[in-house]
UniProtKB/Swiss-Prot annotation:
Cited InterPro entries: Ig-like_dom, Ig-like_dom_sf, Ig-like_fold, Ig_C1-set, Ig_sub, Ig_V-set, TCR_beta_variable
Binding partners and assembly: Disulfide-linked heterodimer with TRAV27*01J42*01C*01 alpha chain. The TR primarily interacts via its CDR3-beta domain with M/matrix protein 1-derived peptide (GILGFVFTL) displayed by HLA-A*02.01 in a 'peg-notch' recognition mode. The alpha-beta TR associates with the transmembrane signaling CD3 coreceptor proteins to form the TR-CD3 (TCR).
Other noteworthy facts: The JM22 clone described as a variant of the public clonotype differs by one amino acid in the CDR3-beta domain.
Protein name according to UniProt: M1-specific T cell receptor beta chain
Cytoplasmic side: 300-310
Gene3D superfamilies, sorted: Immunoglobulins (2.60.40.10)
TM regions (residue ranges): 277-299
Purpose: The beta chain of TRAV27*01J42*01C*01/TRBV19*01J2S7*01C*02 alpha-beta T cell receptor (TR) clonotype that is specific for HLA-A*02:01-restricted M/matrix protein 1 immunodominant epitope GILGFVFTL of influenza A virus (IAV). Classified as a public TCR clonotype, it is preferentially selected in effector memory CD8-positive T cells among multiple HLA-A*02:01 carriers/individuals and confers long-lived immunity against IAV infection. Can cross-recognize sporadically emerging IAV variants by molecular mimicry, inducing immunity toward different influenza strains.
Positions of region (T cell receptor beta joining 2-7): 117-131
Residue span of region CDR3: 110-122
Subcellular location: Cell membrane
Organism listed in the record: Homo sapiens (Human)
Disulfide topology: C42-C110, C162-C227
Length: 310
């Protein structure tokens, strides 16, 4: 590798930038069966001459796969075996994983710079998992656990816990929604999913997240809390022969309603709303019937008066 490229790698590891909209990669998550070819796209609109592809494995630093300094020219990096690239246009530098080998989830990053000796700008990355059998894919099971009374009484705070378990691969995004709107304040999510059985390569994963609100907010039974997990699984084109539902890309959610401390729960609140609605409909029906009866009596009186005058 040239000294210029080595310099760029050092700059990258010490602190490179990301540019919103400047460099795009797709897809964000990808899952493939062992032996298949996989192409990852990278586009940049920064008018940069140099472009790069890196791979990061769990617990390791970035490793250079390929780099290109001009159109129709590219050079191998440290781990070019099993990969191919092309640079037909200045703004595009696709990477193909040829005959993908089984491996834990790897993170692929595309970068660009004005020239090879300049600071590099990175895209958002692509997470790729390769497995020997698609039957290993499972969507998550999601549950929400309500706050403890001890926490509420001692701290006047309420922490809801969301637990997503039993999913593979670890291609998930977790979010909290309160009364139909996504929230970020008070949210603390694990940095990354953890293996349920660390010794197994194809172990399923789990992920937890916490949402902390005031006790008063939790004790309002009109407040609705939802934990949403976006799972990136198989596509519609992937072959599936198992006797369970195909684990396609999907959203899995769990929810909870605020719970008052005076016996007024979300269930009783909803039941009260239903009862009030029914009572309103009954009263409205009675009022309508009464109006019809009064109108009929008035009409009869008018007819009778007309007959008496005749």
């Amino acid at each position: 590798m040239s000294n210029q490229v080595l310099c760029c790698v050092v700059l990258c590891l010490l602190g490179a930038n990301t540019v919103d909209g400047g460099i795009t990669q797709s897809p964000k998550y990808l899952f493939r069966k062992e032996g298949q070819n996989v192409t990852l796209s990278c586009e940049q609109n920064l008018n940069h001459d140099a472009m790069y592809w890196y791979r990061q494995d769990p617990g390791q630093g970035l490793r250079l796969i390929y780099y290109s300094q001009i159109v129709n020219d590219f050079q191998k990096g440290d781990i070019a075996e099993g990969y191919s690239v092309s640079r037909e246009k200045k703004e595009s530098f696709p990477l193909t994983v040829t005959s993908a080998q089984k491996n834990p989830t790897a993170f692929y990053l595309c970068a660009s710079s004005i020239r090879s000796s300049y600071e590099q700008y990175f895209g958002p990355g692509t997470r790729l998992t390769v497995t020997e059998d698609l039957k290993n894919v499972f969507p998550p099971k999601v549950a929400v656990f309500e706050p403890s009374e001890a926490e509420i009484s001692h701290t006047q705070k309420a922490t809801l816990v969301c637990l997503a378990t039993g999913f593979y691969p670890d291609h998930v995004e977790l979010s909290w929604w309160v009364n139909g709107k996504e929230v970020h304040s008070g949210v603390s999510t694990d940095p990354q999913p953890l293996k349920e059985q660390p010794a197994l390569n194809d172990s399923r994963y789990c992920l937890s997240s916490r949402l902390r609100v005031s006790a008063t907010f939790w004790q309002n039974p009109r407040n609705h809390f939802r934990c949403q997990v976006q799972f990136y699984g198989l596509s519609e084109n992937d072959e599936w022969t198992q006797d369970r539902a195909k684990p396609v890309t999907q959203i899995v959610s769990a929810e909870a309603w605020g719970r008052a401390d005076c016996g007024f729960t979300s269930e009783s609140y909803q039941q009260g709303v239903l009862s009030a609605t029914i009572l309103y409909e009954i009263l409205l029906g009675k009022a309508t019937l009464y109006a019809v009866l009064v109108s009929a009596l008035v009409l009869m009186a008018m007819v009778k008066r007309k007959d008496s005058r005749g």
